[in-house]
Design a protein with these regions (language model features):
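Charged, amphipathic alpha-helical coiled-coil/dimerization segments
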Residues: 92-151
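Carboxylate-rich helix-loop segments that flank metal/cofactor sites and access channels
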Residues: 58, 90-93
């Protein structure tokens, strides 16, 4: 009979902070996308994509990390914690949807900057509203005091 170098009770696998953080983020992001699909400022085409689940949390990385002034693809990928290739795929999809465009950067004709289009800026505004709505709902679910402590703790833990 083998002996375990740890407690064989496996309940710890689904009862730790990382597990709860992942589930909370999934719920929060899903609610944000739901709010965006219904937002009156989101262009109809993007609203339909969001409502049909075609816009994923991965696409939100562009919304979350692309500065309003634009950024090089490598900088955007780094900010989102993704590879340049994975971010390039997302940018291609968002470009096809009219959310972003690639434009020349200074004197280097090879360098490109990813920037929001007018549609993308409308999407960004809806994202801001949706995040605020999801946060308000979260505060309602757990209470203001818990939400505040949670926000402060996560900010401290993440090094922010």
């Amino acid at each position: 009979m083998s002996t375990f170098p740890f407690n064989p009770d496996e309940s710890w696998r689904s009862a730790h902070l990382g597990h709860w953080l992942r589930l909370a983020l999934e719920r929060f992001d899903a609610r944000v996308l739901e709010c965006m699909a219904q937002h009156p400022g989101v262009p109809l085409g993007l609203s339909n994509l969001a409502a049909r689940g075609q816009v994923s949390a991965a696409h939100i990385h562009i919304t979350r990390h692309l500065p309003v002034t634009g950024a090089r693809l490598t900088d955007l990928a780094q900010a989102a914690g993704m590879s340049k290739q994975a971010m390039g795929t997302l940018v291609n999809q968002c470009e096809a949807w009219g959310m972003v465009r690639r434009e020349g950067l200074g004197g280097d004709c090879r360098a490109k900057r990813v920037a929001f289009t007018e549609i993308g800026l409308a999407w960004l505004g809806a994202y801001q509203d949706a995040v605020a709505q999801a946060e308000t709902e979260m505060r309602g679910a757990v209470g203001d005091a818990v939400a505040t402590v949670l926000a402060l703790g996560l900010e401290a833990y993440s090094g922010g």
